[in-house]
Amino acid sequence: MRLTPLPAFDNNYIWTLIAPDGRAIIVDPGQALPILEAHSKGLIPTAILLTHHHADHIGGVPELLERWPTLPIYAPHDTRIALNYHRIGEGDSLNILGLRFQVIHTPGHTHSHLTFIGNDLLFCGDTLFSLGCGQIFEGTPTQMLASLQRLAALPIQTRVCCGHEYTLSNAAFALHVDPTNTALQKRRQQANAMRLANLPTLPISLESELNTNPFLRTAAPTIHAATATHLQRTPIDEVEVFATLRHWKNNFPIKNIP
């Protein structure tokens, strides 16, 4: 199977897993056009997986259904997803094109957000980003941290497939928080070179994220110290460290911060 991220909008990725015969699993098609263009080159949509209800992740589905009306769709229980689809949730598993994916509930960004795990791949939508995490629109910091900790416990060789290309803007904030992290410094240099070459910085290994993403390192002394300095007091617990990081980033002066 070939894993390919298809760019959409300004910074979204539509993830595709393509079999040798062209049949493909599609994750979060916010736009139809990238899929239609890939179809002209041999891609055959076989199933759609949706992580959450936001338009930039599901907006292309109606047009794709016009072309492939029997295409199966798997998505969370959420009345805001106005489609005919298979409702799935925590503990479910999917077997598509010979691949098995576990479904886990990862609330925080939205109440019903799902993540798909299998075959050393992690399709995490807007929960975990390269060097960052999603904004907390509907959940709580406690929920979001718990979701991230579940993902952090996966095998380190897992490849993280996020919904957006945010690595460079996330790196700026991460380095502001953790400036002496040499692995993080190296990642920013690598990501900058990749983006200059118009290459995606994803997927990225979970091992790399564990070493460089401040939102996965809330127990690390350097991250704890940085949030204490920002708060001008000692954080109460790890949840407050995380909540402080998220609020801090929300107000960090860089364009296109997620």
From Swiss-Prot:
Residues given in the record as Zn(2+) 1 binding sites: H52, H54, H109, D126
UniProt enzyme class: hydrolase
CC cofactor note: Binds 2 Zn(2+) ions per subunit.
Residues bound to Zn(2+) 2: D56, H57, D126, H164
Keyword Metal-binding: yes
Reactions mediated catalytically: an S-(2-hydroxyacyl)glutathione + H2O = a 2-hydroxy carboxylate + glutathione + H(+)
Name of the protein this chain belongs to: Hydroxyacylglutathione hydrolase
Organism this protein belongs to: Xylella fastidiosa (strain 9a5c)
Lineage: Bacteria, Pseudomonadati, Pseudomonadota, Gammaproteobacteria, Lysobacterales
